[in-house]
Amino acid sequence: MLLKCVCRAGIISIKGIFPRWYSNSQKVANLGQITDYLVVKGVPNLLQKMFKESVLADNVVFRLFPTSHPYIPVLHGKSKYMASLNAMRMIVRKFILGDECRLHISSVKTLTSTSHDEEVKSALQSYNTITCNDKLVIKWQSCIPEDHCKITKLEINDRLKEEKRGNGAGGSFSMRSVPVIDYILHPTANNLNQSVISEYLENAAERSMENKVNETQNSKEDEKKKNDGDGKRSKKKRLSRLIKGTFIFEFNEENSKILVHTIEDVELIHYEKKIATRGAFAC
């Protein structure tokens, strides 16, 4: 009994004498825990499973492409955040990539508000953030199902570079005339079906092809694809797309919850059409 009292008194005295040390230590521990969750489970499995509610602040802020598309409204609150992120997950999983795709993390960077490292300070200034709290920057890309999620970061990056070299300047998707953003921002008030997205993707891909090479050969390949079975064609269409992007998480003061989630630099690589979008594809 005496030992318990001494231990309790000791803990209380540590908190009382070194409140700042205790607070900073707890923040570091929380940062490690939430980073571990997002890197190991949260982001890789996001298409299959929503972030757990316990890591979301009640007043969480959701920002879509604030640097390249500042006109897109910012969402506030856990309910709106979850509804909109679920809408995005559904679009990507059902219409763009496929149910089996995961998000592979290519880089993770922690940006602490108290860091004295010049590189970290420079990185803090380069990201379009809205708080002075600690941050986590995660760059990711979707996997390729036929490789059973075994494709490496280097292989993916090499393929992206190869596609970009072959496409020159590429082309950007303009989201102003497409109902995808409206659906994401207001999923309960808008309807979106597969034909809308499929038609948009095909038309946007065609508009983005500035240099058509070997049209005869391409037409023969298209004719061959038309003769393939519907199942095979559907599978090929799924496997032909790869999405990459950046998540920026800003945490609360205790580093226990996500206060701001920003999505930036999303690109769609369409291997059949050989195009690369520049940060404007909102899926």
UniProtKB/Swiss-Prot annotation:
Record's compositionally biased regions (Basic and acidic residues): 208-232
Region (Disordered): 208-237
InterPro entries: Mug163-like
Record's protein name: Uncharacterized protein YGR053C
Organism: Saccharomyces cerevisiae (strain ATCC 204508 / S288c)
Lineage of the organism: Eukaryota, Fungi, Dikarya, Ascomycota, Saccharomycotina
